[in-house]
């Protein structure tokens, strides 16, 4: 279910900082119309860290309603408190999400045994397909391949979004547990090499603004058209880099705003791009024909 070209969709806000439901619904339609296979609300790119519980539920509920079963919805429900993650995952299930994306505990930096028990507790308590999310650059700790492999045997654990940047780690999971768990790229730069090793797709940032091209590359890999996939991959590199010119999701939200897809409103502590980075972003977007020079 959670394979292919998946988007870590942005959460639009209005000028007063409120969730912009109307624009969010349009963004979802834009994604589905351009071939995106799965919508992932309330992830890192969706600024989930600045949403309160009511807003979190509202974003997921709106997403499920607008998608209307056209594609699966993988709802971000992670927390560094296990009880809170269980609560958020239960809420997502009640609202009709097809699965939950669960970031590994951040800030409190548990041991590998603690990480294992955290995810096992969620999987034991909520009968919903769950995709683990390993992103050491955000959480301050790496979930090892061994820990992921231990969790892969749980019937509710169906995937892992691997954003460690370590192809050896991803390959180890695929080699030892690929028949039990789908390994999904969490880094647009590494989607092609990870899929070449047996990964099942990407949860993409870049797909927010160029979903058709991300889908085309994933499709090319799945159809063993590696020359085509390589061409698309190399063509997208500058755009991938531009999406991380500053902290995600600032560049991608600004890019989407420049393209007229949404406003560029962020919530503190995220702020606007530095002027020189904004100029660089505009140059890249213009080069791809996404905005006028």
Swiss-Prot record:
Main location class: cytoplasm
Catalysed reactions listed for this entry: L-aspartate 4-semialdehyde + pyruvate = (2S,4S)-4-hydroxy-2,3,4,5-tetrahydrodipicolinate + H2O + H(+)
Keywords carried by this UniProt record: Amino-acid biosynthesis, Cytoplasm, Diaminopimelate biosynthesis, Lyase, Lysine biosynthesis, Schiff base
Enzyme Commission number: 4.3.3.7
A Pfam family reported for this protein in Swiss-Prot or TrEMBL: DHDPS
GO cellular-component term (any): cytosol
Function: Catalyzes the condensation of (S)-aspartate-beta-semialdehyde [(S)-ASA] and pyruvate to 4-hydroxy-tetrahydrodipicolinate (HTPA).
Quaternary assembly: Homotetramer; dimer of dimers.
Name of the protein described by the UniProt record: 4-hydroxy-tetrahydrodipicolinate synthase
Name of the gene this protein is made from: dapA
């Amino acid at each position: 279910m959670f394979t292919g070209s998946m988007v870590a969709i942005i959460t639009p806000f209005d000028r007063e900082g409120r969730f912009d439901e109307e624009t969010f619904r349009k963004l979802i339609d834009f994604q589905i119309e351009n071939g995106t296979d799965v919508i992932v609300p309330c992830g890192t790119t969706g600024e989930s860290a600045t949403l309160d519980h009511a807003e979190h539920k509202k974003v997921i509920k709106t997403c499920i309603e607008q998608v209307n079963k056209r594609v699966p919805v993988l709802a971000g429900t992670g927390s560094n408190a296990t009880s809170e993650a269980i609560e958020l995952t239960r809420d997502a299930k009640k609202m009709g999400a097809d699965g939950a994306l669960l970031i590994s505990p951040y800030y409190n930096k548990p041991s590998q045994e603690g990480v294992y028990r955290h995810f096992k507790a969620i999987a034991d308590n909520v009968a919903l397909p769950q995709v683990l999310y390993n992103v050491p650059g955000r959480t301050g700790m790496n979930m090892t391949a061994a820990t992921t492999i231990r969790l892969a045997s749980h019937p509710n654990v169906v995937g892992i979004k691997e954003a460690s940047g370590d192809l050896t780690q991803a390959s180890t999971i695929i080699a030892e547990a690929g028949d039990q768990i789908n390994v999904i790229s969490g880094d647009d730069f590494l989607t092609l090499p990870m899929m070449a090793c047996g990964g099942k797709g990407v949860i993409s940032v870049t797909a927010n603004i160029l979903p058709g091209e991300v889908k085309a590359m994933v499709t090319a890999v799945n159809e063993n058209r590696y020359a085509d996939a390589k061409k698309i991959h190399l063509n997208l590199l500058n755009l991938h880099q531009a999406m991380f010119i500053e902290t995600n999701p600032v560049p991608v939200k600004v890019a989407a705003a420049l393209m007229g897809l949404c406003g560029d409103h962020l919530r503190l502590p995220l702020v606007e791009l530095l002027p020189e980075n904004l100029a660089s972003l505009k140059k890249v977007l213009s080069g791809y024909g996404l905005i006028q020079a």
